[in-house]
């Protein structure tokens, strides 16, 4: 008699995806972030659902409803801070997951990689709209500034912005639709993540050596279920410690003031996880040019499979590419720092140099490094 997990239609799908899945025997801790992203999504959907039960998406009561959640709802403060800091955890895991993909050449699975880029865009859109909901000063002005960027699009820009706003400024209509989209998008992300997994399981996982591992596979369960569980325990312990000891560390103090259209904050800036893109946007004096650079800073990821010139897939044995990769990581830290600084010397020139370096490493230096390594390593 066949065991149930191999015969039952639903259990069979779970079995093929998480139990009997043939997995390379040598994948490292860098492969834990996929499961951790799934955990983040579950945490965000669960905490968000409870917040939505008490939140009101009206300009007059939105700010008060968030205060009410923190003061009057049982453990409302905890749910709110888990949700707010959960977004930061989500992006930390996302960026590490993407970095792993770049370092070990996982982008060669084109379908999986491109769906991953779509997931990144969806997550960024969700996070942006969620930031608007508490209706504090930075929520309001962040929404105004970022949506206004669309007015740089020729011909249709201004009409498009008013269409998104639902009026002539960010107001009740904007807040209501942002709440609706913020609620539905995580479920779309979950569905897209399933497609991401589907394509990944068509090819099987990559591994640190970047070589085919068909001759050396082990079942996902129990080996990687327990390895993932260790990652989950470490991340949850760190995350809860952070939420309970430093809940406001990553937030903006301006967001504790109710939205006021008549008073502009001195420095309008997004959450820390968007600062690198914000720095690239600001480094170009032209509005349309800045918007194009902003979009390209993420879209450039789609070019990685096309710009791969090395004969080896992974960077594990490619010292020049390794150096460039870590330079790129350092550059992203610099851009993140610059994005949080005011637009004045010396920050302007540092941001411009860092932006040029970001695109140069990806589009020029890494492909050249691949060709040099082919020659030098006689591969």
Swiss-Prot record:
GO cellular component, one term: respiratory chain complex III
Cofactor: binding comment: Binds 2 heme b groups non-covalently.
Disulfide bond positions: none
CDD domains: cytochrome_b_C (cd00290), Cytochrome_b_N (cd00284)
Pfam (any one): Cytochrom_B_C
Binding, heme b b566: 97, 196
Main location as per UniProt: mitochondrion
GO molecular function: metal ion binding; ubiquinol-cytochrome-c reductase activity
Chain residues that bind a ubiquinone: 201
Cellular localization per UniProt: Mitochondrion inner membrane
GO biological process: mitochondrial electron transport, ubiquinol to cytochrome c
Family statement drawn from the similarity comment of this UniProt entry: Belongs to the cytochrome b family.
Subunit structure, as described in the record: The cytochrome bc1 complex contains 11 subunits: 3 respiratory subunits (MT-CYB, CYC1 and UQCRFS1), 2 core proteins (UQCRC1 and UQCRC2) and 6 low-molecular weight proteins (UQCRH/QCR6, UQCRB/QCR7, UQCRQ/QCR8, UQCR10/QCR9, UQCR11/QCR10 and a cleavage product of UQCRFS1). This cytochrome bc1 complex then forms a dimer.
Protein name: Cytochrome b
Organism name: Chaetodipus arenarius
Origin organism lineage: Eukaryota, Metazoa, Chordata, Craniata, Vertebrata
């Amino acid at each position: 008699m066949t065991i149930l997990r191999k015969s039952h239609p639903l259990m069979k799908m779970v079995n093929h995806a998480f139990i009997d899945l043939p997995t390379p025997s040598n994948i490292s801790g860098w492969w834990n972030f996929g499961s951790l992203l799934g955990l983040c999504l579950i945490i965000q959907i669960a905490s968000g659902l409870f917040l939505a039960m008490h939140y009101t998406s009206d300009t007059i009561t939105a700010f008060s409803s968030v205060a009410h959640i923190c003061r009057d709802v049982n453990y409302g403060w905890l749910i709110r801070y888990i949700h707010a800091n959960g977004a930061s955890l989500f992006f930390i895991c996302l960026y590490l997951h993407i970095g792993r993909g770049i370092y070990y050449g996982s982008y060669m699975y084109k379908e999986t990689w491109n769906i991953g880029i779509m997931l990144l865009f969806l997550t960024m859109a969700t996070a942006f709209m969620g930031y608007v909901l508490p209706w504090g000063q930075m929520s309001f002005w962040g929404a105004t500034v970022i949506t206004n960027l669309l007015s740089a699009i020729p011909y249709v820009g201004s009409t498009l912005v008013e269409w998104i706003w639902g009026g002539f400024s960010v107001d009740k209509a904007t807040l209501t639709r942002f709440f609706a989209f913020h609620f539905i998008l995580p479920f779309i992300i979950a569905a897209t993540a399933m497609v991401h997994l589907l394509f990944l399981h068509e090819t099987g996982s990559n591994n640190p050596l970047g070589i085919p591992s068909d001759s050396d596979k082990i079942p996902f369960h129990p080996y990687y279920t327990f390895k993932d569980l260790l990652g989950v325990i470490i991340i949850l312990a760190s995350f809860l410690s952070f939420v309970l000891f430093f809940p406001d560390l990553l937030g903006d103090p301006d967001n504790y003031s109710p939205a006021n259209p008549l008073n502009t904050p001195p420095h309008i800036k997004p959450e820390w996880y968007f600062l690198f893109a914000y720095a690239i946007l600001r480094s170009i004096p032209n509005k349309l040019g800045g918007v194009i650079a902003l979009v390209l800073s993420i879209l450039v990821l789609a070019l990685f499979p096309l710009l791969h010139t090395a004969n080896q897939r992974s960077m594990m044995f490619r010292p020049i590419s390794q150096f460039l990769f870590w330079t790129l990581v350092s550059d992203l830290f610099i851009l993140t720092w610059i994005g949080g600084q005011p637009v004045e010397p010396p920050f302007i020139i540092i941001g411009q140099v860092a932006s040029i370096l970001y695109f140069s490493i990806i589009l020029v230096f890494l492909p050249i490094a691949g060709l040099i390594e082919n020659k030098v390593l006689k591969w």
